[in-house]
Structure formats: structure tokens, C-alpha cells
Regions:
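Second-shell loop/turn segments in exported
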Residues: 122-125, 230-234, 252-261
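Active-site nucleophilic cysteine motif
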Residues: 257-286
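Boundary regions of SH3-family modules and the immediately adjacent low-complexity/disordered segments
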Residues: 21-108, 112-114, 118-123, 133, ...
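Sec-dependent N-terminal signal peptides
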Residues: 4-16
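Short, conserved secondary-structure segments in the cores of folded domains
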Residues: 122, 127-128, 193-195, 307-308
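Low-complexity, Gly/Ser/Thr/Pro-rich intrinsically disordered linker/tail segments
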Residues: 344-383
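Soluble non-cytosolic domains of exported or imported proteins
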Residues: 101, 126-129, 237-241, 260-268
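...with weaker cross-activation on analogous glycine-rich loops/strands in unrelated enzymes
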Residues: 131, 282-347
């Protein structure tokens, strides 16, 4: 869907003049960093981590016995043992290193690019954790036995990344990033030089004038970009209309488990949207269900719709087992939802969709186990 950029940026401009905190970003991020497994406050990450702690992190991802194929070929015990041995557990040190991603890359469960699947030609690669955008800060915790992979901590997950996709930097240069003024990508797939940046990406800027930002690329090169080119000063103040326009622009994009092909699954759709506003949500739907205030949990149909009727659109989430849905507000006598979905009920979608809960016969109230919101209640907001 085409975004009217002029109207979109006018909306962002006036949102950024607002002082009403609909989302308490600082408190929310602090809770995520301190309570949600896999999330981390990278700005205050220590220069050293005990070896025993690193070992536990590396061993946490045991081999899933349901995985029967590697690159569509039957897997065997020798292959599994080689994958596990490449984690290099005997060479763990306490020293952490620091870096930034050079380009869009993939974070893996094991130090290999091989696809690990339950069945042949399975679209879901269990080795794929997540896409990571360019210029993301990462903590380098460990190196694989073959020397080709780094085990990293990002703000939203841990896993293995190809070492050639990471710039090593000094601790001081790493820390400087967090105190540097940044822009944020507010529409999808913005090209800068040879790199593609997805929505929510944050990029340091060196200077700006009336028409251009001078941005610092991961390789320290400088690029001048027009201010209307999908960019805004970070963070954008939360506004439901901005969220709506962004989600509408992604409708019909392919569903993509773990972002392996550069698109989104259900949880990355939610995470990327709120990164624009400065919220560092966790990466998977189960962890996202632990963030915010619970406004409904395993009730009946009537209480489900009462809760939605009172909920704030676009910062309220409906949770199913293994799935998260964004609530988009009321539409006459119905209720709108947005989600990236492979299959819903008996229908295969494989894309980002907008639906009506009632008229599209979703029966969502019988499938959901929780509704949460990350918006402040109106009495807790201030002008």
C-alpha cells in the first residue's frame, strides 16, 4: 500500500510536539530489560560476563528432537554432534566484545546457515531466530569453533551471527552510540547506499540542515539523505494514527517466519512498529504477552468484547498460543485486527492482513487467552 508521505510526516511532526505520554517508554523498557528473558539493556551491558553464565546461555538451546532434516536431507547423530561441538564450549572466556551489524543479517540457533526442519520442504526453518537490521549494537559473547560465527546478545534476543556481518568496535565507541542523536526509519525498506533498512532501524546522525540529515553508516562513511525519505528524529512520539498508517502500508507483505527473507512474522510486525516509538519489545509472541497490563484473560465472549471496547487501539494486543494480534479499534459494530499470519483457522493467508473479528468469522474470543495493553490508562497521562 502507498503511504501519502506528506501527510504522514505532517502527522509525525505534530505527534512529536505533543507532551502527553500515552506510553511510558522508560518504565516499559526497564521492565522488559529486567524481566523478559533474552532481552537486554545493551547500553549498560558489562565488559565481562562470568564463564559459567555464558555456558548456560549457550547450552540453553538444546537440539530439538523433532528436527529430522538439514537442508532437506535426513539428519543423523554425527551431524547433530558436529553442530553442538561447533559451539566451542571449552573455549569460553569471560571477556565481552562489542560491535555493530554491517547489513541485514540473520540470527541463528546454531552456528550454521543450514536449514533445520521437521519435514522436507518445510517453510519454517527452526534454525532461524530473527532478522537483524544494519547498524544494530550487539554484544559479542563468544566465537564458534570454526571461527566463522559470533554468539551475540542484541536488545531482543541471543544467537549466532556470521562474523563477517559484524564490525568490532572499542567499548568506548560502542558506548558513544547510545548518547548520539539518531534518526529512525518510519516506513519499510529504505535504501541508504548499498544497504536496506527496515522500519524501526535507528541510525546515528552527525549533522542536519533544513533539508538533509548527514548520517553515519556502519562503516563510518557519511551519507546525506533528504528529510522526507522515510526518516524522522528518534523517537517518534506514539500516535495511533501513525501506527495505523504504518500497518496499512504493510498489508499483503509476505508472512516470513523469523524474517529469513526480509519480511515479518507476527511478533516482528509488532516489535518493528513499536521500535519507531522507542519501545524495545521482545522478539517472540510468548514474551510479548508478558509485557504491559492484562485487561482480559480467559474470559467468555461477552467479557472479551467489553474489554476490547474499552481498549486503546494500536497499543493493545490479543494473544493466542504462538501468535500475537494488534487490535485496531472499533469499526461500527465490529472490531479491527492486524497481524502477520501464515494460517488462521482453516484459511491460509501467508501475509500481513487486516480483518474484522465478527464479520470475518474469526471466533477469536474462543482462541485468545489474554489481552494486554502497553498504553497508560487515561488518568495516568499528563499534558
Amino acid at each position: 500500500m502507498f503511504i501519502n508521505l506528506k501527510n504522514f510526516f505532517i502527522l509525525i511532526f505534530f505527534a512529536n510536539l505533543s507532551y502527553a505520554e500515552i506510553i511510558d517508554i522508560s518504565s516499559l523498557n526497564h521492565y522488559i530489560y529486567t524481566h523478559i528473558e533474552y532481552s537486554a539493556d545493551l547500553e549498560h551491558f558489562p565488559a565481562n560476563t562470568e564463564k559459567d553464565i555464558k555456558k548456560r546461555l549457550l547450552e540453553k538451546e538444546s537440539f530439538d528432537q523433532r528436527i529430522k532434516f538439514i537442508n532437506n536431507q535426513p539428519i543423523n547423530s554425527t551431524i547433530i554432534e558436529n553442530l553442538l561441538q561447533n559451539r566451542n564450549l571449552s573455549a569460553i572466556t569471560s571477556v565481552n566484545h562489542f560491535g555493530f551489524t554491517k547489513k541485514r543479517s540473520n540470527i541463528k540457533m546454531f552456528p550454521t546457515n543450514a536449514a533445520l526442519t521437521y519435514k522436507p520442504d518445510d517453510k519454517i526453518d527452526r534454525n532461524q531466530y530473527s532478522l537483524i537490521e544494519p547498524f544494530e549494537p550487539v554484544i559479542i559473547l563468544h566465537t564458534s569453533k570454526d571461527g566463522e560465527w559470533f554468539f551475540i546478545q542484541t536488545f531482543f534476543t541471543r544467537g549466532w551471527i556470521n562474523k563477517n556481518d559484524v564490525y568490532n568496535v572499542s567499548y568506548n565507541n560502542f558506548k558513544r552510540y547510545f548518547n548520539t542523536k539518531k534518526i529512525v526509519i518510519v516506513r519499510d525498506r529504505v535504501k541508504m547506499g548499498d544497504l536496506i533498512f527496515g522500519a524501526g532501524s535507528r541510525i546515528p546522525i552527525e549533522d542536519e540542515d533544513e533539508q538533509y540529515y548527514t548520517i553515519i553508516m556502519p562503516d563510518s562513511k557519511r551519507i546525506r539523505l533528504k528529510k522526507d525519505d522515510g526518516l524522522s528524529i528518534f523517537p517518534v512520539v506514539y500516535n495511533s494514527e501513525i501506527a495505523k498508517i504504518f500497518l496499512e502500508s504493510l498489508l499483503n507483505q509476505p508472512y516470513d517466519w523469523g524474517g529469513k527473507n526480509g519480511y515479518r512474522d507476527c511478533s516482528s510486525l509488532v516489535m518493528d512498529l513499536f521500535r519507531i516509538f522507542g519501545v524495545d519489545l521482545p522478539r517472540n509472541s510468548r514474551q510479548q504477552a508478558e509485557v504491559g497490563d492484562i485487561i482480559w484473560e480467559r474470559g467468555d465472549k461477552k467479557s472479551f468484547f467489553i474489554a476490547l471496547g474499552k481498549a486503546e487501539p494500536f497499543c493493545t494486543f490479543i494473544h493466542m498460543k504462538g501468535h500475537i494480534i494488534l487490535y485496531g479499534g472499533k469499526d461500527k459494530d465490529d472490531y479491527l485486527i492486524y497481524h502477520a499470519v501464515e494460517r488462521f483457522g482453516n484459511i491460509s493467508y501467508n501475509k500481513v492482513v487486516k480483518q474484522h473479528i465478527i464479520s470475518d468469522n474469526t471466533n477469536l474470543w474462543s482462541k485468545a487467552y489474554r489481552i494486554t495493553t502497553i498504553c497508560r490508562s487515561k488518568e495516568k497521562r499528563y499534558d
